[in-house]
Amino acid sequence: MAFGSMNSSDDSPMSDINVTPLVDVMLVLLIVFMITMPVLTHSIPLELPTASEQANKQDKQPKDPLRLTIDANGGYYVGGDSASKVEIGEVESRLKAAKEQNENVIVAIAADKAVEYDYVNKALEAARQAGITKIGFVTETKAQ
């Protein structure tokens, strides 16, 4: 055996080094570096522009974008008709009709901040299926 006993007559020091803990630590470090390196190499440093309220007022807003409202419960409302709730299939057909009337139609999605992302994703998919490429999101500006 590699381990000596107290009663052994062999007084020479044990020359075998146990490398198992060293290998374990090295493998853990290797795994940590393998996980963190893609995160470090794929980040792109950006300095995003900031917009003031004055700059927002100066932007030319398109005339009457088609408003698609999504309430907190996931209900869809197309246009200014807040009384009639429609299903996602009806949303797509109304967006197609708007695209046929105006080739450059712009959709403004106004989603409640409590709505799940899945409902917004379905609205975006309906707009894509209708062939609409100009889509914006309605937000509130922070009061300073």
Curated annotation (Swiss-Prot):
Residues 40-144 are periplasmic. Residues 1-18 are cytoplasmic. It is a single-pass type II membrane protein. The chain crosses the membrane at residues 19-39. GO terms for molecular function: transmembrane transporter activity. The keyword Glycoprotein does not apply. GO terms for biological process: protein transport. One of its GO terms (cellular component) is plasma membrane. Keywords: Cell inner membrane, Cell membrane, Membrane, Protein transport, Transmembrane, Transmembrane helix, Transport. Its main location: membrane. It holds the Pfam family ExbD. InterPro entries: ExbD (IPR003400). It is found in: Cell inner membrane. Belongs to the ExbD/TolR family. The accessory proteins ExbB and ExbD seem to form a complex with TonB. Involved in the TonB-dependent energy-dependent transport of various receptor-bound substrates. This is Biopolymer transport protein ExbD. The lineage of its organism: Bacteria, Pseudomonadati, Pseudomonadota, Betaproteobacteria, Neisseriales.
